[in-house]
Amino acid sequence: MRIIDRACIAAAFVALATPAVAMDDQATYWRFDGRAEKRLSGIAPATEWAASAWIGDDSTKLRLYNSGIVGDSGHIDNEGGTKGIDSRFFYSRLIADFWDAKAGVSFTVFDGGVTRSGFVAGVEGLAPYGIHVDAVLGVSQTGVVSARLDASYDLMLSQKLIAQPYLEAMVASQNDPAIQLGSGLARFELGLRLRYEITKEFAPYVGVSFEQFTGNTAGFVAAAGEPTSLVRALVGLKFWF
C-alpha cells in the first residue's frame, strides 16, 4: 500500500472527527489523536503511524483506530503478523474511574494483499502510577486467538519535555504462516520517546526502540529473510485536537 492510501486513511479519520451536539442533556465530545513516526535502522527502515478518533460522552463512546507500518520500499511491514495496516471500530463504556471496556471488529491488511478480520474486545485506561494500558483480545476469521498489550507512561521532565517509556507485546494461540504469525509470544518491543510539547496539541519527538520476535514467529520472519531483532532510532510527531 502506497503513500496515497495512507492519505486516504487519514482523511477518513478527519471526516469522522466532526463537532458533536448535546444529546439527552449530556454533553457529547469528539477527539482525534495521531502519531507519525520514522523508524530508522540500517536494515529495515520504515514509516509508522497510529491514529484514533472517538465521539461520545463521559460514559459511552464510539472509537475508531487505525495504525500501520510501511517499509521504505513501499511494502506493508507485517511485523511477524502483529501489525500490517490495522483498522478497529469499538463501542466502549466506562466501567470504573479512568477505565473503559470496549468491544468491536477489526480488519487488517498485510503485505501481498492478505487480510484478516475478526472480533476484538478489551479494556483501556490508567493503571496505578499513571501507566496507560490498552489490552485487547481478538479472534480472527481463521480461528486464531490473540492478545495484545500496549503500555506507556509519561514522565514529566519539565513543563514541556516529557519522556515516555513504552511496551508492546502480542501472543497468539496458533500459527498463521500466511502472515508470519506464530503461536505463543510472537513479538515484544521496548522503547523510549522523548517529546517536546511546543503546544499541548503539537509535539515533535525522538526516541529509540528495541524489537524482538520470538518462538515460531521468529522462525517465519527469519525464513522470509527479515531480521528477528532490531534496534531503531525514532523521529516523529504527536498531535491531537
Q: Could you say what each language-model-derived stretch is?
A:
Residues 32-40, 60-77, 99-109, 130-140, ...:
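Transmembrane beta-strand segments that form the barrel wall of outer-membrane beta-barrel proteins
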